[in-house]
Amino acid sequence: MNTQRAQEIVESPDMVDVTYNGRPIYIQRVDEQNETARIFPLGQPENEQEVPLANLKEH
């Protein structure tokens, strides 16, 4: 996923179907400089992680 699209998803009021390693996730924020995103699996906000944007897939 590119940086611009990830940022659009973060700012969108709608829930967008995005996965990381096949698991549905929520994007909290995007680090444009490092091309990473702070995410957590849906329903598991305690499992935050920083991942490369290239590993996120929009469905």
Curated annotation (Swiss-Prot):
Instruction: Give UniProt keywords alphabetically.
Output: Sporulation
| Entry's induction text | Expressed only in the forespore compartment of sporulating cells.
Any GO CC annotation of this UniProt entry: endospore-forming forespore
Q: Where is it mostly found?
A: other
- Keyword Phosphoprotein annotated: no
InterPro entries in UniProt:
SASP_SspH
- Family statement drawn from the similarity comment of this UniProt entry: Belongs to the SspH family.
User: What is the protein named?
Assistant: Small, acid-soluble spore protein H
Q: Which organism is it from?
A: Bacillus licheniformis (strain ATCC 14580 / DSM 13 / JCM 2505 / CCUG 7422 / NBRC 12200 / NCIMB 9375 / NCTC 10341 / NRRL NRS-1264 / Gibson 46)
